[in-house]
Amino acid sequence: GWLNEDGFGHISTFGGAELGCIAALKTLEICSREETRSMVHYIADYVGQRLAAVQATYPDWFVGIRQNGVILGLEFAHPQGAKYVMRHLYENGVWAIFSTLDPRVLQYKPGILLKPEVAEEMLDRTELAIGKAYAEIRNERRSA
């Protein structure tokens, strides 16, 4: 279904072209700016705190948060849990992809240039998606 149609994720942002090198250099310059680094720290803290609150709501479903700055892995109790959350996020306009090495884990990467108001909306949608995925799993278990 939907994962084969809409679930593709590309891996290389700057690979394979000279123009990619120019874009990569500009990206490094932007990432080195003090205001960018300051915002990354703010967003990372905010995202971590909000996700911890969501995890407290679903402790038996949303079982782990792995975080390094704005790169996160969200771990779910179901063997394919991240796929459920990924689909509900996608339906709510948020792109994240499950880990092919461990489909319990969702790769969640908000980005370094995220504005606080966008982060808040993204996290509201994430909380909704996690809740919907949890309800879906519970309904499947009851039906089985």
Regions found by a protein language model. Name each.
Residues 1-144:
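Conserved N-terminal phosphate-binding loop of PLP-dependent enzymes in the Aspartate aminotransferase
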